[in-house]
Amino acid sequence: MVVLDDDPTGIQTVHGCLLITQWDEDSVRKGFADAEPFFYILTNTRAMTREEAEQVTREAMEMVVKVNQDYGYRLIIVSRSDSCLRGHFPLETDVMRQCLVAHGYSVYEKTPFCPAFIEAGRVTIDGVHYMRDGERLIPVSETEFARDNVFAYHTSVLRDYIQEKGANPNDYIIVNAQDYDELYRFAEYLTSDIIPQTSSIVIRSSSSLPKAISGISDQPLLDKSILKQAGVGCFIVGSHVKKTTQQLENLLQQEGTCAIEVDVQRILDDAPLLMSETLDTIQQVVDMGLTPVVYTSRQEIRLDDANLRQHLGQQVSDFLVDIVYRLPFTPAYLVGKGGITSHDILTKGLGIKSARVLGQIINSVPCVMAEKFPYIIFPGNVGNEQSLSEVFNKLKG
């Protein structure tokens, strides 16, 4: 199984496998040769324009197909995306199917569609997708995620969602799932004789189905034993969704943290001076024995043009990455909050080309090991108000 992940948080249910951040031949061969029968390729296409996403998906698929010539595996290709239905759909699965067919693969005629993310309370019941909030089930189309600047949608009925996005619902299998038992049953179906064993499969899913297909066992949540050194950590918060803001406010109430706000407008107007000021402040905070919490101003700058919105997001992310690259101290751990932010920190700020997934520090929050410290990839839309604080309190000295 090869999972093409459209942002870096898709490993939030697995452990032990490889995450590769490039799709050159050597990197993909490393994934195929690994002892685990599955690996993740971080394409990060959710942060790209439609045209960029198509090109990257095609490049990654072409390399997967090329390397598999030496292995001859029946391929299960997973397009891992958002449990709140944001992302380049059906573009990515269309490109995956096209690449396989073009190289002579027999591909199962239906594309399973499984946005359920059990750990975070994202469930599909009778073809309708919900977000669990305590005892309530909220249709995802009624959440802020449905009003996303780039990937907005208007329905929680998955057949209607598929049609809204320009695809034919009859080409998909809607996977209803409220728990892992249902996902394990569907995983058994995928490998049963009902589907020809010579057929490869293309799947669109969130994070839970790949775990069910892989068959990996559960493991305990990670703890302080992952730390290589004592001292304070560092939080970099780029996501601006409501849940992140609530988590940020709670984190900043914890004794031992210190807020460092980065004004997004100043990134656009006066980035060099702002960078100098921010790095100086981080050093002062660390000298006081406090954990710096660097975050972008919470007011979203709304733009009508989708490409301009993507460009703005990239400018902000580049600034945060530069902070990580130029950190004036070595943290005991680093937390990146938000999809674009955590990806760019991983690949640019830390320069990681491949990494072993350690597991999760708290439910649905994955961790990989950088050269000198663990790096925690915290999705923007996961957890409750205390979740960032929980990570801080779990790892503080």
PLM-predicted stretches and their roles:
Residues 1, 5, 12-15, 27-29, ...:
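Cap/lid and interdomain-hinge subdomains that line or gate substrate/regulatory clefts
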Residues 3-5, 77-80, 106-115, 169-177, ...:
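General beta-strand structural signal in soluble alpha/beta enzymes
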Residues 8-10, 81-91, 118-120, 179-182, ...:
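Gly/Ser/Thr-rich loops at beta-strand to alpha-helix junctions
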Residues 12-40, 277-290, 356-372:
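N-terminal short beta-loop-beta anion/metal-coordinating cradle
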Residues 17-21, 330-332, 340-390:
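Conserved, well-ordered active-site substructure
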Residues 86-92, 305-311, 344-351:
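Short glycine/threonine-rich loop-to-helix capping motif typified by GTGT followed
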Residues 127-281:
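Conserved, well-structured core segments that form the ligand-binding/active-site neighborhood
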Residues 282-337:
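C-terminal structural cap/anchor segments
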